[in-house]
Amino acid sequence: MSDAIAKDAVNTSSEKEPVSATPELKTSGSPDAAVSSGDKKKKKKKKKTNNIKNIALLYPDEKYPEGEWMDYHQDFNLQRTTDEEKRYLTRDAENQQRWNDMRKGAEIHRRVRKNLQNKLKPDMTLTEVVNIVENATRKFTGVDENGDHVDRPKSQGVGFPTGVSLNHCAAHFTPNAGDQTVLRYEDVMKVDIGVQVNGYIVDSAWTVAFDPKYDNLLQAVREATNTGVREAGIDVRLTDIGEAIQEVMESYEVELNGKTHQVKPCRNLCGHNIAPYRIHGGKSVPIVKNGDQTKMEEGEHFAIETFGSTGRGFVVPGGEVSHYAKSAEADGLPAPSLSRAKSLLKTIDENFGTLPFCRRYLDRLGEDKYLFALNSLVKHGIVQDYPPLNDVQGSYTAQFEHTILLHPHRKEVVSRGEDY
């Protein structure tokens, strides 16, 4: 989920959310086994099988696969004194559960996106797409129709609303209830998925394009993200990562309808560090050189994401809002005066806390006629809204993103999979 530099937005309204195999019939070759057509057994249909189940059943020891390990290329990250080693071993023991939670979330993320990739095709509605993602996430984490974890709704599950931004829309779009937008063959769709376990969020995204004419655009952004992952490390300045990303992305061109476009970084979109139950932890990882001398630190958890565009390379907010999150400053603000806003805030606190949410999630919880109250919470700074972020109409944008963990000796690309 992107960290946008542009912060203003517009509010409008809308609401409400919404195989089997047949085996061959085998008969004996013996004449005695012959039966009349009227006595033939009916073919029995197998019950539907569902490979999506609570992932804890697949890993009964609760030890989840590690991500891709990468060396730091900065020498100072490779040299540690004995005292530092001892301190790390103490911290490492304390951090094991955190790392394991991240790895659990990442394994669920890989399985969720594979499930979607097997089903994705043109002419699906975007609502169908996000339901496939989010229902699978709930089942893998054990938060499903059976009501598991209802007493602890924030313990694990969806990390933020599934982004399915199309074409010139780069980020922060998920369908509201009643949205009938259809994914077409000629579309470029960014799929941004979040999974959280005990508040530790795995944030990873890729771009879907059925038409091969967009291949260079996708390749540019994929390579730019991989460059950002390679450059990231302890004590690395954020501006240096942005400079490396920019150089790679701008080296690509894409030809569309007879016109050649240089792929441009969306310069006001960034990666970010991630804090417990908070998708944007305070540091932004630029995708262009911006002079930010802030450094990455040991133990931090970053989403390295890049966005490339055939347009201006600059996004502005616009369109119907779907993404929201409780503000970091909310607890220090006066309580809402509207009784409906108070009850809605209670629902938000109990089910999301500071995790991002969308209108569909409120619908799913049985909330109705809440839009005025929600806008009131936004107006008073208690809730932050995140409108869709768009480049110019007619342009195409792509995104790739990985979550990394900065260990003392190496970094772990926890969300890496066979797909990207």
From Swiss-Prot:
Q: Which amino acids does the record list as binding a divalent metal cation 1?
A: 192, 203, 401
| Binding-site residues, substrate | 172, 280
Q: Which residues form the signal peptide?
A: none
Please provide the Gene Ontology terms (biological process) for this protein: proteolysis
Q: Does the keyword Iron apply?
A: no
- One Pfam family linked to the record: Peptidase_M24
What does the note accompanying the cofactor annotation read?
A: Binds 2 divalent metal cations per subunit. Has a high-affinity and a low affinity metal-binding site. The true nature of the physiological cofactor is under debate. The enzyme is active with cobalt, zinc, manganese or divalent iron ions. Most likely, methionine aminopeptidases function as mononuclear Fe(2+)-metalloproteases under physiological conditions, and the catalytically relevant metal-binding site has been assigned to the histidine-containing high-affinity site.
**Transmembrane stretches, by residue range?**
none
Q: Name the CDD domains for this protein.
A: MetAP2 (cd01088)
Q: Which domain of life is it from?
A: Eukaryota
**Which cofactor does the UniProt annotation name?**
Co(2+); Zn(2+); Mn(2+); Fe(2+)
Q: Which residues bind a divalent metal cation 2?
A: 203, 272, 305, 401
Primary enzyme class: hydrolase
Q: State the residue spans of region: Disordered.
A: 1-48
Tell me yes or no: is Ribosomal protein among this UniProt entry's keywords.
Answer: no
Q: Enumerate the GO terms in the molecular function aspect.
A: initiator methionyl aminopeptidase activity; metal ion binding; metalloaminopeptidase activity
Keyword annotations from UniProtKB, A to Z: Aminopeptidase, Cytoplasm, Hydrolase, Metal-binding, Protease
Q: Where in the cell is it found?
A: Cytoplasm
Enzyme Commission number(s): 3.4.11.18
Location (main, coarse): cytoplasm
The catalytic activity, as recorded, is: Release of N-terminal amino acids, preferentially methionine, from peptides and arylamides
What family is it from? Answer: Belongs to the peptidase M24A family. Methionine aminopeptidase eukaryotic type 2 subfamily.
Briefly, what is this protein's role? Cotranslationally removes the N-terminal methionine from nascent proteins. The N-terminal methionine is often cleaved when the second residue in the primary sequence is small and uncharged (Met-Ala-, Cys, Gly, Pro, Ser, Thr, or Val).
Name assigned to this protein? Methionine aminopeptidase 2
Q: Which organism is it from?
A: Lachancea thermotolerans (strain ATCC 56472 / CBS 6340 / NRRL Y-8284) (Yeast)
Query: In the UniProt record, what gene is named as encoding this protein?
Result: MAP2
